[in-house]
Amino acid sequence: MILSLFKLFGKENFFIQDSYLESPILWIDSTILIQVIGFLKKNNTCSYEILFDLFGIDERTRKNVKSFPNADFTVSYYFFSISNNSDLILKVALLKEHLQLPTISSIFLNANWYEREIWDMFGIVFNNHPYLTRILMPKNWVGHPLRKDYSSHATEFDEFYFTKQKEDLAMESLKFCPKSWGLENNDSNNSEYMFLNFGPNHPSSHGAFRIVLQLHGEKIINCIPDIGYHHRGAEKIAERQTWHSYIPYTDRIEYLGGCVNEMPYILAVEKLAGIVVPEKVQVIRILLSELFRINSHLLFLSTFIQDIGSMSTVFLAFTDRQKIYDLIESITGARMHPAWFRIGGVAKDLPKNWNSLLKKFLIWMPKRLDYYVNIAIKNKILISRSKGIAAYGKKEALSWGITGAGLRATGVNFDVRKNRPYSGYQNFDFEVPIGNNISDAYTRVLLKIEEIRQSLKILNQCLLHMPLGSYKSDHPLSTPQKKNKSLFHIERMITHFLQMSWGPIIPSNESFQMIEATKGINSYYLISDGLTTSYRTRIRTPSFAHLQQIPSVIRGYVISDLIVYLGSIDFVMSDVDR
């Protein structure tokens, strides 16, 4: 592909960057951006069907830039080819005097929200964008938070007083004006539309999430998702926390996923540090990840059934989830957010009784799952409410950057654990459930149930084949180092003290890790400048892409169908807003 780009656009228009990424990174000039991206999408040899991620970088305080093109800011386009299982990253350098790029939202539909986020966080303008407004920050916010000259400490700001004038401005910004959202008041027959706020505090919106609905009678003509109510500045926080002390924050990106969220961050840091962990560490990480996957899927399954009108499954599923939490707590000492993975290993070795607790759960859960299928999933009302509802195909899924069960329901056989195995998943025997070309609400639920069965299969293999050995690498950047190492000599004690107080110094470079998270593909793109903190931490979450697709899927349906659709997506707003 790179040779084809050189031949078509001229080698002099590209700069190849070295990194720890398996994917090539090409810097290109903004004048050929649209042509290059159009070629990547339509190329017959290797088509990059998915714009996987799109994010900005403030380069102004970065020291280790090697021979990179001169840039104050950089915009990175991460393309993903499902058919060839390959990636390509394009970077465009920008100077602060000209922070403008052409929008690519007409080529990749999902670029819309990503470009809005970049403008929101960095102030980079995308010309001809259909709706370039703030997306995560309040509309009356001043400044662009991910710029390096925007402080991450509240103590460095002036004192804040919420005056009556500020309150009025805040309330005014929340008022709904259809035209400002690109919506018409009347149809072609001059019939007036009704506009309805669904959320941000509706029980079926699954979090602080607002959808503005344009209705003609009961039919949804259009809708606009409004996100950002749960934004906590997770990427900004990473710039002030050490590589080690940021681990607890990863748990809370998708707060149901627990250790699953820690996996991509830890693996990306270990790539930067050059750490290879023992086999036992890999299997322990898989053990915890699959427990959390089942836990998350059970909540999804039970709340989906509840949204349709049946309450029993919620109470039953929470009994099962309690058993999982008891098992997780016995291993990690915590329940929802254990922050248990470490750079170079895990926090502790497995306790003595871990296998007996896991064995009991593996006996219990399969029968319980069959029970849910019989009492709810085969129910005629549930089938009629969800089968054929909110349906889309492979082309639409790829256009919107859909991953996970939503994509696999369209017949695309892609699971990161199988196609790009990490942490030793290549040593496990399990199947990837896929659908039959159309992803509707019912199919997405069926796939999640089958994914639980496959996770149980993986857990059984962890039980039977847990390796012997250490729970932590001997690498000097493993944090914290083993106690017997740090207590052996005063010099090593000093190293331990520095790593835990100031943080480990990670070599300068860039790394990337994607994983199959509970709700789709989650990834971390890390940039180290050779310091104890990350220079840039980019968190790509599946739910951000999934919610952007809502208007294209739900037009023509009614509100009750919207509730079924939202329940079938499987999202939490912390995963969307970060």
Curated annotation (Swiss-Prot):
Name this protein carries in UniProt: NADH-quinone oxidoreductase subunit C/D
Family, similarity comment: In the N-terminal section; belongs to the complex I 30 kDa subunit family. In the C-terminal section; belongs to the complex I 49 kDa subunit family.
EC number in record: 7.1.1.-
Catalytic function, reaction form: a quinone + NADH + 5 H(+)(in) = a quinol + NAD(+) + 4 H(+)(out)
Signal peptide: none
SUPFAM superfamilies (alphabetical): HydB/Nqo4-like (SSF56762), Nqo5-like (SSF143243)
Keywords: Cell inner membrane, Cell membrane, Membrane, Multifunctional enzyme, NAD, Quinone, Translocase, Transport, Ubiquinone
Annotated InterPro entries: NADH_DH_suC, NADH_DH_suCD, NADH_Q_OxRdtase_suD, NADH_quin_OxRdtase_su_C/D-like, NADH_UbQ_OxRdtase_30kDa_su, NADH_UbQ_OxRdtase_49kDa_CS, NDH1_su_D/H, NiFe-Hase_large
Record membrane topology: Peripheral membrane protein
